[in-house]
Amino acid sequence: MKLIVGLGNPGPEYAFTPHNAGFLAIDRIALICDVQVANRRGRALTARTRLAGHDVLLAKPETFMNLSGLSVAALLNELELGVTDLIVLYDELAIPLGTIRVRERGSAAGHNGVKSISGVLGTEDWTRIRIGIGKAPTETGGIVKSGGKDFLLSPMRKQAMKELDESLDQAVRAVEAVLTKGVGAAMNEFNRKVEPES
């Protein structure tokens, strides 16, 4: 059994915001597996299914982003799993929209959901799939803003959603690669730099 967690904020007002890319990725996996992420368990909405020949529990924490670690720890404990059984999908400002990166471990790099998980689990050694949302139009004093609104929590425009859609497909393939080939092989496959077209 593997625990696959997407990070985001609960509530319809956050549904299609950049910060909810992790939730959207879980929804995409659920769609492919023909399940609904609706069972409440471990402070999250969950669905048990099979993906790439593996038993998995899909989860979307209901704790809000900054407390995601509480939900992840509760689920790992309930399922009697370790951090090696965890895959987390989340948004990443430092990665261009339409791309993803797979990592075996790493720092939070300012992401409060990741910081919460690492803090509660006491380690940064867990697999993550970072979904690129691109840089915000303006960054000042650590607050990411776009036209006076918080970029991360503002609904995405149609073109941005189209590009994010490509990232979500890649994220699903990356999860399948981690499950079937391992993290190293998934990193080799998905972390290659794309050469610009001439």
Segments (PLM) and residue ranges:
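Nucleotide and nucleotide-moiety/phosphate-recognizing core
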Residues: M1-A108, V114-R130, K135-D150, S154, ...
